[in-house]
Amino acid sequence: MRRWLVASMAPQLHQLLQPVRRCHHPLRIPSVQLAAPRSHTHEDIAYASCPACSRVVHMCDMLTHLITAHRELDQTHCRKMCTERLALYERVIGVPLKKSELTSSGRRVLDFLPTVLPTGYMCNWCDRRSDVYATRDKFLKHVADVHTDIDLEEVEPHVPLPPRGVVVEKSNGDGGPQPTRRLNGVVAVAEKSEPINAVPRILGISLPRGVDRPLKATAQFSDTEFPCELCNRTFNSEIDLLQHLETRHPDGTAEGPAGVDSAAIADVAQFSAKEATTGGDQRVHVICDLCVSSSKVYKMPSALFSHIRFKHPNEDAAFHVERLIREQKTVSSFVCTVCQKAFASAAALDGHFNSKHAEQGEAQNVVGRVTANNCWWCHDCEKGFSSAKGLHGHMQNKHGLSSQTHPCPACKRVFADIYSLEEHLSLQHKTIRLSDIGLLTHVKCSTCERFFLSHEDLHRHAVKHHKKDPRAPAQPFEAPTSASHVAASTSAAVPSEVEATASPQGPRKVKKRKKTTEVSEVTS
């Protein structure tokens, strides 16, 4: 009975096992896909999670990671996914993605160690992984010769040793390696490899900003914009302009309009390098008087040198930079208290403040009404405090004011600041005052009724907001005359009784006055 059932079911079992026998090739999974980026930004497009292990990998290294760590995936499908994502990055950002970027782990070298095969080592740092090195020493020699940017001493301890029991036999026979089994009707075809013609990459800024937009040659620039004289791009600050000149036009070989003098570019680069080494922190407020109608204020000598070198090529740029800085050193400038931009006139500053910082007008109005909550003023950040101790702590935390201990002259107790000492004296030693020991707690501005911690802060405040002469001393000298001198000078014309009623607080020199009257009677 059993034999009859097996014989009857044999054709059905043969049909079921036939598809399985045909699947002699290894399993490939082409259905994996990269997750769509959350937004079209550099961070979200340049990095992606591996669809197999969820590891965040840089897109320039994603293909290498997929075909080395997940060999069960289809290489053609993986290459197509990576190519589409790189094309999306170039279409959105505007430039190809650089391969010099590191992976998320920051150790790109150790993330792609060589693959150990039965026949040797395969280098994963090469773009084309077709060569296999038979020994570990040959692989390390390849790394030292080809990949010079990789530290060999750092990589060598992590390169694994060849597995035990693997012996590479060298045969001197005429025939090469032959397959052990062939199917009927199958003809062996030699493998052909076509070289890949890689498109040369265009090196540039990986993250172009909105302010770096190209403009027409006839465009008109406002006083708050800083254009590049070579490619007509505009920037919002001089620092951005200088960085653009150093990166895009360093030696005259970068892209630029026809007719640009390469010597001028070299002079600008040399002047900027000299300024960075000798006086890179110098800040000035200079207007170019060579231009007929120009009200742009230059705050860096290198930016002024670049303007004169390109706009006025027949002039000596270095001489005029030194001359303008020397002549306009004492000229008062108009600087915005919010964004620190300089302007040539008060009207230009008011227009900028009303258009750019209208909402912060009340908060930044220095000459406004003084209240008890903001009478203690910080000149650096234009902010008021309700107490001197709060202003002192702000100056220490934000502006690096040096801390100094103050001992009590009576009980020798040490305090961290002068205001704690003043509070201690008012409670424990009421007969001692800070003025008796020569300590100053604050100074007051006579114009706006604000308090400052030192005469230097008051001087800078008065120069900036009350048109004080910057050459004037920060601390005024004491008057040579006093109340006693005034009273003595007016004693001859005013009787003693009237003088006593007019100035009861003045000192009375009765003995000296009597002596002078007696001497006058004797002489008469």
From Swiss-Prot:
Annotated function: Plays an important role in mitochondrial mRNA editing by promoting the assembly of the mRNA editosome. Facilitates the recruitment of mRNA to the REH2C complex and promotes the interaction between various editing complexes including REH2C, GRBC, REMC and RECC complexes.
Assembly information from the UniProt record: Component of the REH2-associated complex (REH2C) composed of helicase REH2, associated factors H2F1 and H2F2, and mRNAs at various editing stages; the formation of the complex is RNA-independent. Within the complex, interacts with REH2; the interaction is direct. Interacts with various editing complexes including the RNA editing core (RECC) complex, the gRNA-binding (GRBC) complex (also known as the MRB1 complex) and the RNA editing mediator (REMC) complex.
Gene Ontology MF terms in the entry: DNA-binding transcription factor activity, RNA polymerase II-specific; sequence-specific DNA binding; zinc ion binding
Subcellular location: Mitochondrion
UniProt zinc finger (C2H2-type) residues: 48-70, 121-147, 226-249, 286-312, 334-357, 376-399, 406-429, 443-465
Low complexity biased stretches: 479-500
Region (Disordered): 463-524
Transit peptide, residue positions per record: 1-22
GO terms under cellular component: mitochondrial mRNA editing complex; mitochondrion; nucleus
Signal peptide: none
BP terms from Gene Ontology: mitochondrial RNA processing; mRNA processing; post-transcriptional regulation of gene expression; regulation of transcription by RNA polymerase II; RNA processing
Keywords from the named record: Metal-binding, Mitochondrion, mRNA processing, Repeat, Transit peptide, Zinc, Zinc-finger
Lineage top rank: taxon: Eukaryota
Protein name (Swiss-Prot/TrEMBL): REH2-associated factor 1
Classification via PROSITE patterns: ZINC_FINGER_C2H2_1 (PS00028), ZINC_FINGER_C2H2_2 (PS50157)
One Pfam family here: zf-C2H2_jaz
Disruption phenotype: RNAi-mediated knockdown at the procyclic stage causes a reduction in mitochondrial mRNA editing. Formation of the REH2C complex is not affected but REH2C complex association with the GRBC, REMC, RECC complexes and with and pre-mRNA is impaired. Integrity of the GRBC complex is not affected but GRBC complex association with the RECC complex and pre-mRNA is reduced. Causes a slight decrease in REH2 protein levels. Does not affect the RNA unwinding activity of the REH2C complex.
